[in-house]
């Protein structure tokens, strides 16, 4: 026999009806199951840090954290983010694998921070996707070449206090500069005194800084070291020669001053007998 809702009500006793009323509806059943399955806690999505927000720009997922007072790369960035803006913060370094959880990231803005250190694996996992990277207006004096190996990107390196060494020349062989930013790559106070204030691209066009795998500044240091070592070696040889000659003269003078010992009579008679 088919039981309709009206017939069910007619057969429902007060105790049974009270029990059925206490059962959760279908809309509340799923959260209840989630609570049971997660040990009593309801999982919640990661909330962006204060000052950050997610937006869709030109149909692409964008995560903006500009001027958010960040001192480290934040967590909670959606893994489908294509454009990430971390500019105008207080980031001092980028650790290894900082963005490897963002498999479709195409554009990364790290400009106007306090970046002084870049890990050689800072952009690990972005080799096939990253296209634009902004590192301008930071405190970068040198960057590891391996950080850019495999990346097909346009990069802005202007407004940093570069050492203008072999490492920078190698980086520029790995990447393409954003048009119009090359003149902003200027040698900082930590560079060789004769390079400070000069545009690096002009220097790199006139001088090979990586001859035989060594930078020009490194070669100058090596030459100075060799000259110093040569000077010390010459002084040591001169001292040894002087010491030998002085000892030889002293030996001669000692021999001349040595007294002649008299021959005893017994020795003379023995000598005569032998003869």
Curated annotation (Swiss-Prot):
Membrane-crossing segments per the record: 225-245
Annotated SUPFAM superfamilies: L domain-like
Subcellular location(s) of the protein: Membrane
Keywords, ordered alphabetically: Glycoprotein, Leucine-rich repeat, Membrane, Repeat, Signal, Transmembrane, Transmembrane helix
Segment forming the signal sequence: 1-41
Name by which UniProt lists this protein: Leucine-rich repeat-containing protein 3C
Bilayer topology: Single-pass membrane protein
Homology family: Belongs to the LRRC3 family.
Coiled coil (residue ranges): none
LRR repeats: 80-101, 104-125, 129-150
Species assigned in the record: Homo sapiens (Human)
Stretches assigned to the LRRNT domain: 42-79
PROSITE patterns: LRR
Keyword DNA repair: no
Source superkingdom: Eukaryota
Glycosylated residues (UniProt): 156
Any GO CC annotation of this UniProt entry: extracellular space
Domain LRRCT residue range list: 160-212
Lineage: Eukaryota, Metazoa, Chordata, Craniata, Vertebrata
InterPro entries: Leu-rich_rpt, Leu-rich_rpt_typical-subtyp, LRR_dom_sf, LRR_TM_domain-containing
Keyword Membrane found: yes
